[in-house]
Amino acid sequence: DAKIDAALFTSYHCINYYSDFLFCYFGRRYGFVVTPDAATSISAGIDGGQPARRTFGGNVTYTDWQKDNYFHAVRTLTGGVKRLGIEFDHINIDTLNLLKSEFPGMEFVDIAAPSMRLRMIKSAEEIAHITQMTRIADIGGAACVEATKVGTPEHEVALHSTATMVREIAKTWPHGELLDTWTWFQSGLNTDGAHNPVTSRKIEKGDILSLNCFPMVAGYY
């Protein structure tokens, strides 16, 4: 509908969803360029060959020897493109200005909302994957209950839950990546905020407890 020639995804969620590459930012730019003929991730040299080995599509790795190497990579993948889709809700002003400077004849079109709508439509394979994730989350919850006792610190409960989920993920997907699985566990006053961090507070009798288990595989939880 947007009549774009290609798309440059830059966000964690879109790059991970469309390429299965969960990058680690550390001040470097990443991307996933999709054209009618190819899908290619753009990664920094610090990642070595991991993006090429583990992710969907092709891969271009750029070095830090020159500051504009990222944009050179984008240029090599978007030759002849007049209308490029980008994520307006993710690209900051600095990057947008650099894109406009590097590609003066290119028109940039917002594809943030359309790409989100595409991610909302789940395939049968995705549904099967999510079903496995809920099973593993239940295992993490049971481990949390197992570890919860008066006098036990929050972090010990969370660690037991997380370790149990990681082991089950490794068993379920022997060749998968084990990254970012975690547990939110709060007790007592610490339950007053949904996103309060885990602390070393010890559980007391009569405490309200809050639990969220996040088994993370391929960007799903």
Language-model segments: residues:
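A composition/biophysics-driven feature that prefers long, compositionally simple stretches
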Residues: 1-140, 198
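Secondary-structure edge/capping motif, primarily at the C-terminal ends of alpha-helices
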Residues: 144-148
